[in-house]
Amino acid sequence: MSDDGLGDAASLTATVLEEEAARQEAQAEAKRDVIFADDLLPGVGSEEMELKEGLRKGGFYTFAVLTALASFDELEGAAINVLGPDIAETFGVSDGTITFISVASVAFFVLGAGPLGWLADRMKRAPIVGTASLLFAVFSVLTGAAVNAFMLFWMRFGAGISKANTITVHSTLLADTYPIGVRGRMYATNTGLARTAGALSPILVGAIAWWAGGLEGWRWSYFVLSIPVAVLAFFAFKIPEPERGQWEKSDVLGQSLDPDNEQIPISVEAAFARIWRIDTIRYMTIALAAMGFALFPAQAIQSFFLEEEFGLDALERGFALAPTGLGLLLFLPFIGKRFDQTFRTAPD
């Protein structure tokens, strides 16, 4: 083959490789997620808004129902920790068995967040909240009616999965219903009221068990506390479905879009890329991973310690454990207000 032929072949090969490299670069560019600067994010630089005004814009109904549901969920959630010694004696099982079931209940709560979040992205959310809350009430009743530790385990499994709607479904409903400028204070108020119920729950569940009397008085705590959750579940079905991302669209475009339009799919990678840039999220995730395994068993063991060392009954254990949940409540109002102020200027 002549030198000219070899040169033409080499030139053709180089051209093909260059075209292929350009094609791959174009494909990569098309798939590359764009992360906008902070000052272009929805809500940044907006005017300050009073919490009451923000709640009025979205309607008080959604906030009231979801906050009440979260509060009663917290009330029931403390029962197994406070009443653990009585439950163990009823079923004739060890402290370790009830501690395991208590810790597993927390794991079930986290486990249910994924499936319910998947549903919340694809369906109307009010029916999910109503159905999950109703199931939570049913499993709470069945927990009180448990005949052995094996049944108790599976009833807590069902209760934990259904309660998980408060993690993923509640938060998205609130975010889409109320303006960006009040979300910090709104979530602080929502969480504060729920945590207040959680702080008082040891006293309440202990009082119900003490009032019912007897070795199996603990069952009545589950029976009684399931009633308001069941009632609120029916109110949850009436929660109006807000347009997804309506306040973000309004802030960026000046108006929300037609809710009947097909939703643009969200890139999970882009969402995580944006969220993981927030220092608070990174630090909190690492801290929870480090502390979680130590904190969860501690809540279940406290009641056994108080009963064995000091002979406290259910009501007395409730009074002893209640103060441990009050510290957070002192700071939530300030944290919520500070968040709203900071987000408008430095969201990262």
Language-model-derived ranges and their functions:
Residues 92, 124, 145-151, 162, ...:
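Helix-breaking motifs and short loop linkers at transmembrane-helix boundaries and internal kinks
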Residues 43-56, 243-285, 309:
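Juxtamembrane intracellular "pre-TM" segments in multi-pass secondary transporters
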